[in-house]
Amino acid sequence: MVVDDTDHVRTMLAEMLELDGFDVVARSASGDEAIAAVGGADPHVIVMDLKMPGIDGLETTRRIKEARPDQAVILYTAYLDATIEAAAREVGVTLCLGKIDGLPELERQISRLTLELAGDA
């Protein structure tokens, strides 16, 4: 599942992940959309942007984790620093990645988390 308020970023990220063999079960443009979609989509991993209008990625994660405590969430943001990483840990983000780390690193981490969730890691 990809959550990003910027249309072209959300589309590009989802399409690149799909081209590389990942099943993107949902795309959401806001935290509220993500919260509404997550139950029906049942994603293994959520790739979450931080800065979005309305509720941000941290609050969205907090609300999702209330209902789905084991949900894996990767915070994927251009605004990563130690303060944001600490806040992300507090709400249950599984992993923080800067967008500067690039798509290959994101894909490696999604693969790793998927294997861990399947019990194969």
Residue ranges and their predicted role:
Residues M52:
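Receiver (REC) domain active-site loop signature in two-component systems and cognate sites
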Residues L58-P69:
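Short amphipathic alpha-helix used as the core "switch/output" element in two-component signaling
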Residues V3-D4, S28, I46:
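Conserved sequence signature across two-component system core domains
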Residues D7-A26:
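Two-component/phosphorelay signaling modules centered on CheY-like receiver
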Residues A41-V47:
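Active-site beta3 strand of CheY-like receiver
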Residues S30-E33, D56-E59:
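Acidic catalytic/metal-coordinating carboxylates
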Residues E59, L80-P104, R108, R112:
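Alpha4 helix (beta4-alpha4-beta5 surface) of REC/receiver domains from two-component response regulators
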